[in-house]
């Protein structure tokens, strides 16, 4: 069996923040994990670094560089992967809230994640990437200290 370090962390976690790391449609690559974690009884919150014009939507601005959307959110632009996903999730009878992080730089992104951690209190954060713009193992030495579960 392949030993994936994140697997043991996710097994112990009850609440997980699953986030697209590179933006755009990256969050979609995490959907198999989302459904597996939900089937295991976990609470899973979704977030994504967004390339959409999130402030031009009816989503709720809840923190620094952070907008909460759901299937009832409206937008005047067609490119909004998170909104399409929220509507699809609602059609699947799944929770449809997605947290969109504006791509404004490292400090606002870190502040958005801090806000999400303070308000959602996840036991684990899992970043997913659909390409190669993020190659990390999760225990990389340059990452901030993480909580052991």
Residue ranges: model-predicted function:
Residues 3-6, 76-89, 109-122:
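Short, charged beta->alpha transition segments
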Residues 26-30, 34, 82, 86, ...:
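Short, highly selective alpha-helical patches that border small-molecule cofactor pockets
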């Amino acid at each position: 069996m392949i030993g994936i370090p994140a697997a043991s962390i996710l097994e112990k976690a009850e609440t997980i923040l699953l986030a697209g790391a590179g933006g755009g449609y990256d969050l979609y690559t995490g959907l198999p994990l989302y459904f597996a974690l939900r089937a295991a009884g976990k609470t899973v919150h979704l977030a994504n670094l967004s390339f959409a014009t999130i402030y031009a939507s009816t989503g709720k601005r809840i923190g620094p560089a952070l907008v909460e959307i759901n299937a009832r959110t409206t937008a005047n632009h067609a490119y909004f992967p998170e909104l399409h996903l929220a509507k699809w999730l609602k059609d699947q009878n799944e929770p449809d809230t997605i947290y969109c992080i504006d791509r404004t730089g490292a400090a606002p992104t870190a502040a958005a994640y801090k806000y999400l951690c303070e308000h959602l209190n996840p036991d684990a954060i899992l970043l997913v990437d659909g390409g190669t713009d993020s190659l990390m193992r999760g225990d990389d030495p340059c990452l901030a200290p993480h909580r052991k579960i």
